[in-house]
Amino acid sequence: MRVLVLDTETLGVCDPTVYDLGYIIYDDVDGIIVARDYITKEVYGQTERMQTAYYANKLPIYEQRLADGYCKQVKWAYILRVLQRDINKYKPDGIYAYNSRFDTRSIAKTCAELGVNKNPTADGILDIWKGLTDPHITQTEDYINFCKAHGFMTKHKKPRPQAKAETVYRYLMNQTDYVEEHTALEDSKIELAILLKALSLTGARA
């Protein structure tokens, strides 16, 4: 089994332009064989726009990681070329994201804004949440009780268990104090862990 798990960080829900795209390619023989984190040069370079981003408080983290070489700031077209090259080279059995509808939309929106026509995810990204964790983890009695016990409930008039990646990871790893970083590569790592656990619970393959 070989999978590609990706995550995007965007300016916001109302402006889902990608400034950070990270992904991991994993197989069940060698583990993680590719890990990449790219900052979109055309977006990140717009200082005023970045200051209004939903996770603008993460900017110092990005500055440090760029300085350390942990991530690279490159043009959007280059990011997608590398992603396509990795897909062609490693031939993953599936491309996944947690709440993939958001990532699909954000990548398409960024392509449209920046005039990039070749989108490696245009055929769709498989959803870890709706496809696997929702039926097999977050609707189980054990998960519901876990969320109730620790206060991981939504703020709806009738609260229900949170289904976001952070809470699912807390449950699976029994780490109630875990806080999602909300940077693309690091979030891809926890999404991979969730995917692998969900696949093991269902006996399914990617």
Where are these regions (language model features)?
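Conserved non-catalytic scaffold segment of RNase H-like nuclease domains
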Residues: 2-110
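Conserved protein kinase catalytic core
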Residues: 13-15, 133, 193
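A short, structured active-site edge motif that brings together acidic residues
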Residues: 38-42, 120-137
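Active-site-proximal helix-loop-helix substrate-binding element of RNase H-like nuclease domains
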Residues: 44-62, 130-186
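Short, polar/flexible loop-turn hinges at active-site or ligand-entry regions and domain interfaces
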Residues: 65-70, 114-120, 175-180
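Acidic, Mg2+-coordinating catalytic module of metal-dependent nucleases/exonucleases
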Residues: 91-101, 105-106, 110-111, 151-206
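Substrate-recognition/cap helix-loop segment adjacent to the acidic, metal-dependent catalytic center
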Residues: 102-126
